[in-house]
């Protein structure tokens, strides 16, 4: 790290410390009870209060100006590639005339920003008057459990489909909240043309642009990217293990398959019968290979694809027939016939 980079990192750390010192928000319980994320400090407690096996959606308050004036909306994700943790989709929106606010925030591709810088921008989005008056945002935390079950179910749902459904769901929730959307900018998953066609079919009245590297081209997408990335980072920091595991910070690494710390975590924290803790995406080849190498092999009988044919028993089968006088002859019970038992007395 160069001397200049070292100075920048130190400044960012100082800013984060100032956020903690100057933030006079209520305690963790109030964060969870209010359901509002009003600063960076509130993000972790909010996430910690949610069930991490289920998806969580959060929408900020909509600035009044976003209800009245035409807005641009950006969409991006964080955590698509890792084998560990959730994938987070984020949106951010502001009036078409409010580019200055995005510039003042310093919005840029979240992957090119340090963690400290992302945290500072996220905090400013939620605390600075020039931002809260015209910028809104929302995220969906898509659990590893949802990702795995979607990709493993009989009618498989690919990660691209999960991503597109989340993006469209967040756009729809912004519409329902009253945001006056005019333009939408999306960082693509898969071919941009197909994604754009799908979005236009769902939202035909919007001007929609789907592009590669949109987070480094459009500041509104950069803002969405920052919200998504900061949310994912904090989701990992406050992750609760219902399996009862005690995991130290950073013991599972970045979560990316190529990270040796992550690979070691997958090797050490594997149950030979039940597999991995809920943090892991079972559907990733890295996890599948680790299970194949270490876990017990399981065999399950394949259910018959054809439904069995049941012949209904007719009521007349229980009777032998009738006598000449028309009296019905009742069939003897199989239990007595097999044991050669018969009635010796008439009652």
Swiss-Prot record:
Entries under CDD domains matching the protein: RNase_HII_eukaryota_like
PROSITE patterns: RNASE_H_2
Record-listed E.C. numbers: 3.1.26.4
GO cellular component: ribonuclease H2 complex
Pfam families xref list: RNase_HII (PF01351)
Cofactor: Mn(2+); Mg(2+)
Transmembrane segments: none
Residues at which a divalent metal cation binds: 76-77, 187
Biological process (GO), any one: DNA replication, removal of RNA primer
Catalysed reaction equations from the record: Endonucleolytic cleavage to 5'-phosphomonoester
Keywords, sorted A to Z: Endonuclease, Hydrolase, Metal-binding, Nuclease
GO MF terms held by the record: metal ion binding; RNA binding; RNA-DNA hybrid ribonuclease activity
Designated name of the protein: Ribonuclease H2 subunit A
């Amino acid at each position: 790290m160069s001397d200049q980079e070292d100075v920048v990192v130190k400044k960012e750390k100082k800013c984060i410390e100032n956020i903690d010192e100057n933030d006079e928000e209520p305690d963790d319980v109030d964060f969870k009870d209010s359901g509002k994320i009003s600063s960076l400090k509130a993000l972790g407690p909010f996430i910690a209060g949610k069930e991490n096996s289920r998806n969580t959606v959060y929408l900020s308050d909509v600035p009044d100006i976003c209800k009245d004036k035409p807005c641009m909306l950006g969409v991006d994700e964080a955590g698509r590639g890792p084998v560990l943790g959730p994938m987070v989709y984020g949106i951010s929106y502001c009036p078409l005339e409010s580019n200055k606010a995005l510039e003042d925030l310093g919005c840029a591709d979240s992957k090119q920003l340090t963690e400290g810088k992302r945290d500072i921008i996220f905090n400013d989005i939620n605390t600075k008057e020039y931002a809260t008056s015209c910028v809104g945002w929302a995220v969906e935390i898509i659990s590893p459990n949802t990702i795995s079950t979607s990709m493993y179910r009989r009618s498989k749902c690919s990660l691209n489909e999960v991503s597109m459904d989340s993006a469209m769901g967040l756009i729809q929730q912004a519409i329902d909240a009253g945001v006056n959307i005019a333009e939408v900018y999306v960082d693509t998953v898969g071919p941009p043309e197909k994604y754009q066609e799908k979005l236009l079919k769902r939202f035909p009245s919007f001007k929609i642009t789907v592009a590669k590297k949109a987070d480094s081209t459009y500041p509104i997408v950069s803002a969405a990217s920052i919200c998504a990335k900061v949310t994912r980072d904090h989701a990992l920091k406050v992750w609760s293990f219902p399996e009862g595991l005690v995991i130290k910070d950073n013991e599972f690494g970045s979560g990316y398959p190529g990270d040796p710390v992550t690979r070691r975590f997958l090797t050490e924290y594997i149950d030979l019968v039940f597999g991995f803790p809920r943090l892991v995406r079972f559907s990733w080849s890295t996890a599948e290979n680790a299970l194949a190498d270490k876990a017990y092999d399981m065999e399950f009988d394949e259910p018959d694809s054809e439904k069995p044919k049941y012949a209904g028993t007719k009521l007349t089968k229980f009777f032998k027939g009738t006598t000449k006088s028309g009296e019905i002859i009742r069939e003897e019970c199989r239990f007595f016939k097999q044991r050669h038992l018969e009635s010796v007395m008439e009652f």
